[in-house]
Swiss-Prot record:
This is High affinity nitrate transporter 2.6. Disulfide bonds: none annotated. It comes from Arabidopsis thaliana. Induction: Not induced by nitrate or by growth on low nitrate concentration. Strongly up-regulated upon inoculation with the plant growth-promoting rhizobacteria Phyllobacterium. Disruption phenotype: Loss of plant growth and root system architecture responses to the rhizospheric Phyllobacterium.
């Protein structure tokens, strides 16, 4: 049925296609007003999308309460999958006081298992980056969920320290879903809001580390009420996260979509998307020095957070003589802060970019990461329970916001190797966690309190390299963009990832579109300077 459009129906950008603008919505938008005279045409290729999109068909509006396909559905499938994997990976942490008595674990055994739980994901996240670039985020997410589910079920059958460590190592592989989650949102949403979207997806997924601190003791208690002994109840409790992973894997395969225009394999067969070579994707990821700085930065933001998920419950339980339930609630509040802290970091990055460009994003990243690390030092030195809780909450907000701000920068490092760079950055988080747990929490050399303070000092020092991240087209914290007319263009930076032969085949066109949509990273002042001055100096009078 045809509809008559009028001015009162709303203009493009204020409503969905074919829907009036009268509905109340909750959204974050960067779309500029478009004159109402520009009517929607039936041959508009973007008309099939529920949200306004850019030239790459990436959404320019973020509506967290919507499940519209493909953009918002990919967002929700991505973060819930990651959330589920976080629950599984850290499900053992709040039950350690019971598990250690059942398996006769020493402090060293517990520390090594904590390292193992995050070490496996170093390799799986690297692999996931390549999988996303070559096969798409949908397959990567689903395979990670379903292939690691048997390991979660296996936790019910461990009999000694060795099997406990091995199973936690294998479960940790599922944390690779973080990479597919961030990749998925990066290809679905435009750069102007990518900090907020990635912050919400990553933060809400990380929240699983807090939820599991409440969920697993609760499930354990419920199973005990049925008549099971404590040493049996904790084993049955692991069936819950295992089942959740299988369910999410099926949902991702059946409901998900790789890219705004369809699944990657379908688009490659039709010739709409070129099939890339792994060697090329790998080379442009590892040779970019910015990748390795992000690797280190994430190692001491997300890495610190992963370490805290493994030690914080036991720290409050032992240091302040709390019950298992009370220690779990306090520990959960650390992870639950992700609900707003990480999105705040991403949003702050987006706002800084609108005002100051990429340089603003880098400053926000350094400030948040340094502040979070300082509060980590304070947490280790806190001598009373209220002060320790306050320090922990401030520390969690700073560190988690830094994670959000970092993934406001990461999508701009490379267009061709986006997945692999996301994988390397994510692997940095697990590497940093493994290092900090090995150095400070896996032996009797330091108390847990001393380990927390030393970890904070290390995080402060490792936040300094952000000053060396320089984009020729946008500059860095202290240096301006390149004065070279050619190098100062976004098209030159992203086009350099393609050979002349590849360009002649048109394989670089996606990167050029991305470059055009990334000009907002110049900042408001630079954008205004690029607007040509009208030939007539006086405005028309109306």
């Amino acid at each position: 049925m045809a509809h008559n459009h009028s001015n009162e129906d709303g203009s493009i950008g204020t409503s969905l296609h074919g829907v009036t603008a009268r509905e109340q919505v909750f959204s974050f938008s960067v779309q500029e007003d478009v004159p109402s005279s520009q009517a929607v045409r039936t041959n508009d290729p973007t008309a099939k999308f529920a949200l306004p999109v850019d030239s790459e068909h990436r959404a320019k509006v973020f509506k967290p309460l919507s499940f519209a396909k493909p953009h918002m559905r990919a967002f929700h499938l991505g973060w819930i999958s990651f959330f589920t994997c976080f629950i599984s990976t850290f499900a053992a942490a709040p039950l350690v006081p019971v598990i250690r008595d059942n398996l006769d674990l020493t402090k060293t055994d517990i520390g090594n298992a904590g390292v193992a739980s995050v070490s496996g994901a170093i390799f799986s996240r690297l692999a996931m980056g390549a999988v996303c670039d070559l096969l798409g985020a949908r397959y990567g997410t689903a395979f990670s969920l379903m292939l690691t589910a048997p390991a979660v079920f296996s936790m019910s059958f461990v009999a000694d320290a060795g099997s406990y460590l091995a199973v936690r190592f294998m479960i940790g592989f599922c944390l690779a879903t973080f990479v597919s989650c961030q990749y998925w949102t990066s290809v679905m949403f435009t750069g102007k809001i990518i900090g907020l979207v990635n912050g919400c997806a990553g933060g809400w997924g990380d929240m699983g580390g807090g939820v599991t601190q409440l969920l697993m003791p609760m499930v354990f208690h419920v199973i005990k009420l049925t008549g099971a002994t404590p040493f049996t109840a904790w084993r049955f409790a692991f069936f819950i996260p295992g089942i959740l992973q299988i369910v999410m894997g099926i949902l991702v395969l059946t409901l998900g979509q790789d890219l705004p225009d369809g699944n990657l394999s379908t688009l490659q067969k039709s010739g709409q998307v070129s099939k890339d070579k792994f060697s090329k994707v790998f080379w442009f990821a590892v040779k970019n020095y910015r990748t390795w700085i992000l690797f280190m930065l994430y190692g001491f933001s997300m890495g610190v957070e992963l370490t805290i998920n493994n030690v914080i419950s036991g720290y409050f339980y032992d240091r302040f003589n709390l019950t298992l339930h009370t220690a779990g609630i306090i520990a959960a509040s650390f992870g639950m802060a992700n609900f707003f802290a990480r999105p705040f970091g991403g949003y702050a990055s987006d706002v800084a970019a609108r005002l100051f460009g990429m340089r603003g994003r880098l400053w926000i990243l350094w400030i948040l990461q340094t502040v979070g690390a300082l509060f980590c030092i304070w947490l280790g030195r806190a001598s009373s329970l209220p002060i320790a809780i306050l320090a922990m909450m401030l520390f969690s907000m700073g560190t988690q916001a830094a994670c959000g701000a970092l993934f406001g920068v990461a999508p701009f490092v490379s267009r061709r190797s986006l997945g692999l760079i996301s994988g390397l950055t994510g692997a940095g988080g697990n590497f940093g966690s493994g290092v900090t747990q090995l150095l400070f929490f896996s032996s009797s050399r330091f108390s847990t309190a001393e380990g927390l303070s030393l970890m904070g000092v290390m995080a402060v020092v490792c936040s300094l390299p952000v000053a060396f991240i320089h984009f020729p087209q946008w500059g860095s914290m202290f240096l301006r963009p390149s004065q070279d007319g050619e190098k100062s263009k976004e098209e030159h930076y992203y086009g350099a990832e393609w050979t002349e032969e590849e360009k002649s085949l048109g394989l670089h066109e996606g990167s050029i579109k991305f470059a055009e949509n990334s000009r907002s990273e110049r900042g408001r002042k630079a954008m205004l300077a690029d607007i040509p001055t009208p030939e007539t100096g006086s405005p028309a009078h109306v």
